[in-house]
Amino acid sequence: MNSQWLEGTVRHRRKYPVQHEFSYSTGMLALDTDEWDTVSGVSPLFSLERFNWISLKRRDYFRPDTGDLSVAVRDHVEEATGWRPDGEVELITHPRYFGYVFNPVSFYFCYRSGERPADGVVPKVIVAQITNTPWHDRHVYCLETIGAEPNQAGWRTERFGFSKRFHVSPFNGMNQHYEWTFSFRGPDLRIHMNVLEGDRKHFDATLVVQRTPLNRKDVHRSLRKFPLEAFKVVAGIYWHALRLKLKGAPFYSHPDKLPEDDSAYRRGHDDSGLDVTSSETNDKIRGRVSSWRT
């Protein structure tokens, strides 16, 4: 089985106009999407399309009305980049826990033929599926890597800078841009995101995880360690939102509630492959990014 489990930590830091920080341990699934129909066989506590301790449902992921998830992602990447993934398409996500899930972001790592994610290879394309709450809108960014060489510590790092096209948090406005960094080294994975407005950093988030085997023993160990991960994620979102409100963080309305001639309303509404690669970031930022309304 190619699918794996990921364990590590998440950290969020709000820098401006109020300061706020938290971190927590987490467990996630790294699913070879071609194993969608068979991965649940690893444990009686894991099911497909039905209730269990952990489960997967097709409707939670990219283009749920198109059937096979792997094919849907490959079709989209081909449309967005002209290259059809001929290797593994790996989904990084939280599964459902007792029937519930909320993923602020799920990643699809698209590899070339013969490449193994466990070797720390950089995927040729990364698709980021963003979901906001409580609206549950979805948006996709398609990131094209350039094939970074390893540094002295063995990390291969890809950097992207692009304009924000989707309302995620009521505590972040739309007039912002992102710097995303993906670093790969063997079983280790790091993802870092900066949120900036002009030259000022408002927020950053970091995910640091390590790959572990996806077998019955390790799944059960992870469930003991992270028994209610999906509930923890969404409870944390609302708890820290309350704390931000009490600290006086400014509140931004959903763009759909704004006049249609407002720039915040227009951003993202008509995106269908728009190149949003930012010119505001430094010369270390590389890789093309396109934005897709879904």
Predicted regions and their residues:
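Mature, function-bearing regions of proteins
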Residues: 1-294
